[in-house]
Regions:
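Bacterial N-terminal signal peptides that target proteins for export
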Residues: 1-9
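Active-site neighborhoods and metal-handling regions in enzymes and metal-associated proteins
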Residues: 2, 20-488
């Protein structure tokens, strides 16, 4: 009898597991975590408001499909052209999914759809699952009712693959200024449609559409334990990718070969996509181009390499940067510039903890650097001035937040209040010598913990001797050389 009971319990679980795998649904977040996020959102918008979050459109051509960060954060659903309706009056959540597309499923595999109601409820925990076809006609007016609550929706661009909000803002501005284009961003078009299809002034109070972006930014700024685990894994993969690139460094190798070495490690460890395009820069001019991306230059003895590169691992990323010598040996001048960057980074990270502001930490690290300057005289006065300027200005010290995007939403809001556990950001101290066109930096991604800080990338070599040693090892580029040489 006991075995038969176990069978009846086991069979549905196995069927659910098979269904989940068949629908390609994420396994990192349970329904309880999504419910916690919805509850926080409800608390912010109030009990007399509703929210609508639009998912990503279909991928163009053979682009890798990827959901927008906010929609994935709230649902874990990757199906394109989906919508999430959160009703603060009832605290009920409805997801609208497209009807099942059998033709698409035959070509690309199954996705959650309006035909998988029970499965979606089990996986996501939503109260209702409906078809996007149900959103036609008077759906919006009927859903709002006679009292017409405020309607929240994101006003700011929603990030997708290898995208951050700042870069999207720039792209949208360029499109708007193009006299032969001028398309409105998708989120702006949605706002216009909501106003057009909502209640009219003559038959109900006018619909007030409000910005949900700041609320989502605040929610995403504090990472859960599961989110931290994904960023930790993304950081590990990024670090080992950079290690493989450093091992592969030789004079005569091309920047794109180092890029390939790192990307090989990313793919080998389950990262499907890049978190952002690779910065693999060699030589003064390329390094001094902050977001250099061409990666076509041949490495030359005497140059430094800057690699800043990390994957997108299950919708979470890291941010990491290291510099090393092409020929395996730092010059005395390079050491004199890089040592203060490393020491400043260490002093900053050691002092990160909850309950203090970044300004307090900057002051504490600056005091520690004063002692270091006293004990470590410079041979080059210009370099000393550059190092002191870095500390005085806090250049790059507390950089951008990191999470689902490399420059995560929320801008630099974490610096405006005492630090809290779960805040993730990059520490990127930067030294500049404009007279010599020099720009040097090291970058790590950290999380504030209840006891202090965790540096996700502290396993990666950063001390100069250790970096030199890495470049003397054989890398994948030497083990698997290019198939053919580019013709001269």
């Amino acid at each position: 009898m006991t075995n038969r009971v176990h069978q009846w319990i086991l069979i549905p679980l196995l069927l659910l597991a098979c269904s989940v795998d068949a629908q390609h649904y994420q396994s990192d977040f349970p329904p309880e975590e999504f419910r916690g996020r919805w509850d926080k959102l409800f608390d912010r918008i109030g009990d007399d408001a509703v929210a609508l979050v639009q998912g990503a459109p279909s991928a163009r051509g053979f682009e890798y499909p990827r959901q927008t960060n906010s929609f994935y954060y709230l649902t874990g659903i990757e199906t394109p052209h989906s919508y999430l309706w959160l009703d603060g009056r009832s605290r009920e959540v409805t997801v609208f999914l497209p009807p099942r597309n059998e033709r698409l499923e035959k070509g690309e595999g199954k996705l959650l759809s309006a035909a998988t109601v029970d499965l979606v409820k089990q996986l996501v925990g939503v109260d209702h699952v409906k078809s996007t076809d149900d959103m036609q006609g008077n759906w919006l007016r009927e859903s709002l009712g006679k009292e017409v609550p405020d309607l929240y929706t994101p006003f700011r661009p929603e990030e997708g693959y290898a995208q951050s909000r700042y870069e999207l803002d720039l792209a949208n501005t360029n499109i708007a200024n193009d006299h032969w284009d001028g398309r409105l961003p998708r989120e702006i078009r949605l706002i216009g449609l909501l106003k057009a299809r909502g209640p009219k002034p003559w038959d109900a109070p006018e619909l007030q559409v409000r910005d949900l972006s700041p609320i989502l930014d605040d929610l995403r700024m504090i990472k859960s334990e599961r989110e931290v685990a994904l960023i930790r894994r993304a950081s590990e993969i990024a670090g080992y990718g950079v290690i493989e690139a450093a091992r592969s460094t030789r004079p005569g190798v091309y920047e794109y070969e180092l890029d390939a070495a790192a990307r090989y490690v990313f793919l080998l460890n389950g990262a499907r996509l890049d978190g952002y395009r690779s910065i693999t820069a060699s030589g003064i001019d390329n390094i001094n181009t902050g977001h250099y991306f061409r990666n076509t230059r041949e490495l030359r003895s005497g140059d430094l390499v800057l690699m800043d590169y990390a994957p997108d691992y299950r919708y979470y990323v890291s941010d990491i940067g290291r510099m090393w010598p092409v020929n395996g040996t730092f010059t005395a001048e390079q050491r004199e510039l890089l040592e203060p960057v490393l020491r400043y980074r260490d002093f900053l990270i050691e002092r990160i903890r909850p309950g203090v502001t970044t300004d307090q930490i900057l002051e504490e690290a600056a005091a520690a650097m004063e002692d270091w300057f006293d004990d470590n005289p410079f041979n080059n006065k210009r370099y000393e001035e550059a190092a002191r300027d870095m500390v005085e200005k806090g250049s790059g010290a507390f950089s951008h937040p990191v999470g689902m995007a490399v420059h995560d939403d929320g801008d630099y809001n974490y610096r405006r209040a005492p630090l809290q556990p779960g805040i993730v950001f990059s520490v990127d101290p930067t030294i500049r010598v404009p007279e010599e066109n020099l720009y040097l930096r090291y970058e790590d991604t950290v999380v504030v913990t209840k006891d202090g800080v965790e540096n996700f990338t502290d396993f990666l070599a950063s001390e100069l001797d250790d970096l030199e040693a890495l470049t003397r090892e054989e890398g994948v580029v030497q083990k698997v050389p290019a198939v053919t040489a580019w013709p001269e």
